[in-house]
C-alpha cells in the first residue's frame, strides 16, 4: 500500500524570499511532496486520507553546511562519511561541504575528489579542493583542474596561506567564480591560546588568544578583496566583535561565515565546559557573540556553518590543550539555534533559514534548496519536542566530542525526506 500523509494544518516555508504559510497543507507520498494547499486537501480527500494536525510544526527546505571536517571518511573508529551523512540528514541537512584535511585527505588533485557521493544517499557532499600543496602555503595546487573536476571551491581548511601566495592565486584567477574560503587566523599570533583574551579567559586560567590573531589577517584579506573584486574571497569562521566592526567599514566586503557554536555560546557561559570551550577560532565573550548575531541579522555574515571537527573516544582522552580543537553534532544545530535566535532573540523562521540554508547555498554557488512537487528534499521541524541526544541513537553522529549529548534539547527534526544509508540496526 502506498503511504500517504496529509499534514493539515502545518506551517510551510517554500523557499527563499517566501514567507511562512501559517495554515498550510502538504500531501506526502512515499516521502515525496505530492501537493500543497487546497490541491493537497482535495487529493487526500479523493484518496480517503485523513489529516494529521501539525500546526506548530514547520515544513521547510533542507539545511546546507558550508564547511566541516571529516578526518577519516572511509574508515576509522569514529565518524565516517556514512555516519556523518546519516546524522546530518537526521538534523535536516541536505548538503555538506567538506574541507581538505591535514592528513591524507588533502584533495590536491582531481582524482582525490572521487568516492564521496553515495548512490544510496541524497545528501549532496561537496568537496573543497586544497588551496596549497600539503596545506603548507608554499606552492599552489592546480586550481583550474580541481574546479573543473567538481571542487566546490578552494581552501586550506583551518590554515591561512601567506598573503603573497593568496595574492598570486587571486591574480591568476584559476578559481574563476568559485569561492576561496580562508580563515582570518594568524596561527603564530594565536600561539597556544585557547580562549579569546579577556577577563573570562583569565579567570578560567587557560592560555589566551589575542584579538590581533583575527583582526590582522582580516585586514589583510579585506585588502586582497579590494584588489581583486572579481574574486569570491570568503572569510571562514568570523569570531570577534572587532572583526564584525571591521567588515562594517568596508565598501567591498568579502563573504563571511560563522560557526554555530560561536552564535550559541561564549566563554562567559556558565554552561561552558572544557570540552566545548576549545574550538577554532577561539571562543570569545558575550560581546563577541552579540556582535556575531548582529552581523548575521544585518547580512554582514551570510552563513552559519556547523564546522564539525569530529574526534573519536581515544582522542577525547587527551587533555583539552593537547588535542585537536573542535566539536561536532549536526543534529543539535537547528534545535539550539531555534531556541537562541527565534525564541530568545525574536528572529523569524525566514531569517533563520536564510543563514542556515539559502545563504549557505548562495555562498557555495549552488541552487538554493526549495520545496517542490515530486521532491524528497524537505524537513519537518517540531520546536516543542523535548529530547535527549545520545550516542546510542542509530541516527546519531559517532563523534565523541558532541557538547549537547545527554542533556535535554527543545526542538527536533522529526522527519526528513532525503534518503540516507540504512542504520546498522536496520
Predicted regions and their residues:
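Divalent metal-coordination and catalytic microenvironments
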Residues: 10, 26, 31, 56, ...
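Histidine/acidic residue-rich metal-binding segments in metalloenzymes
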Residues: 140-304
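N-terminal metal-binding scaffold of metallo-dependent hydrolase/deaminase domains
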Residues: 1-45, 421-422
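His/Asp/Glu-enriched, well-ordered alpha-helical/loop segment
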Residues: 203-230, 297-298, 303, 309-381
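Active-site mouth loops of central-metabolism enzymes
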Residues: 66-79, 126-139, 158, 207
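C-terminal cap of metal-dependent C-N hydrolases
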Residues: 375-426
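Metal-associated gating/positioning segment near the N- to mid-region
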Residues: 41-42, 54-117
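Alpha-helix-loop-beta-strand connector modules within alpha/beta enzyme cores
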Residues: 109-128, 172-185, 332-336
